Amino acid sequence: LWNKAFLRATALGELDENLDGNSVRKESLVGRMDWIGVNWYFGITVEGAPNSFMPDFSPLLNVNPLTFVEGVNEPDKLEGLLGWVQDELKLPIYISENGAQDDPNDPDHMSRFVVQNLDALQRAIARGIDVRGYYYWTFVDNFEWNHGMSRKMGMYGMDGTDPAKTRTLRTAGTLYGEIASQGQIPAAAREKHLP
């Protein structure tokens, strides 16, 4: 609700001041965005609640960022979201963040994530959705919020305690380079990583 209200206001000039579903047109807000960036890591299915939690929402709400757990990759939900953005906001789309953690127990995890999400983007583009760019998060392992250097999400691995900051290309980085240079997902990667 909050995201939709903000996006509709800044893209279309339809301001829902009370978040009650009733918008007023504000010409001064129309066209404030040239494009929209979508940060996508995984989908979450939510269900309605009998009572709104909004009256209880407070700036003092305490969320522990250390409880973050990467969800299941559901690229069909990414494709659906892109369709909603296109239909609702009529703006060009950039995937401004998309990435997965390295999994030492599953060496194909990051590569599979990249292939499945880029395949979803290809399907969306084939349907006429105006996706103009894709940015993987992140190029190299980095300092993530309260997790420090423990989240290994980079195409290049890096030991944050190493004074030389030596980088090691991960398999997913090699594959992403092949995809970028060929302009498509290689057949072998499609066969290996797509259901």
What are the roles of these predicted feature ranges?
Residues 1-110, 114-195:
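Active-site region of glycoside hydrolase catalytic domains
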